[in-house]
From Swiss-Prot:
One of its GO terms (molecular function) is rRNA binding. It holds the Pfam family Ribosomal_L27A. This is Large ribosomal subunit protein uL15. Residues 21-35, 42-52 have a biased composition (Gly residues). InterPro entries: Ribosomal_uL15, Ribosomal_uL15/eL18, Ribosomal_uL15/eL18_sf, Ribosomal_uL15_bac-type, Ribosomal_uL15_CS. Residues 1-53 are annotated as: Disordered. The keyword Phosphoprotein does not apply. One of its GO terms (cellular component) is cytosolic large ribosomal subunit. Keywords: Ribonucleoprotein, Ribosomal protein, RNA-binding, rRNA-binding. GO terms for biological process: translation. It comes from the Bacteria.
Length: 146
């Protein structure tokens, strides 16, 4: 067998149906669109969420809540991600961004307590969870809120 002799498995490739090419094809005349109506027209079809004139679901349900324009979203870093740094390293948001631990700074960095930390690090972040702070200090490191 050579590369130019390769063929797809039988039945794995299907030829596309050419519609509107005579009644003998089985998809002629109306081309599978049925008779008249909105869906038979060019560009026809109903918009997303349209339920045939019945009040759509999104209008039957009540409005709820609002978007807080002052919301702060923190980039989240779990403890186990900090093990990649050497002992005694000062871990800053800039360093986390540089090393690819976080992709965006957002409103700051929050350290969460998932996983174990074995290194003695000085961690500077905008927020710490109680369990993260406890674990870093138990490993001999320091935490600093910036």
């Amino acid at each position: 067998m050579k590369l130019h002799e390769l063929q797809p498995a039988p039945g794995s490739r299907k030829e596309r149906t050419r519609v509107g090419r005579g009644i003998g094809s089985g998809k002629g005349k109306t081309s599978g669109r049925g008779q008249k109506g909105q869906n038979a027209r060019s560009g026809g079809g109903v918009r997303l969420g349209f339920e045939g004139g019945q009040t759509p679901l999104f209008r039957r349900l009540p409005k709820r809540g609002f978007t807080n324009i002052n919301r702060k979203e923190y980039a989240i870093v779990n403890l186990d991600k900090l093990n990649r740094f050497e002992d005694g390293t000062e871990v800053t948001p800039e360093l986390l961004l540089e090393t690819g631990v976080i992709s965006k700074l957002k409103s700051g960095v929050k350290i969460l307590g998932k996983g174990q930390i074995e290194k003695k690090l000085t961690v500077k972040a905008h927020k710490f969870s109680a369990s993260a702070k406890e674990a870093i200090e138990a490993a001999g490191g320091k935490t600093e809120v910036i």
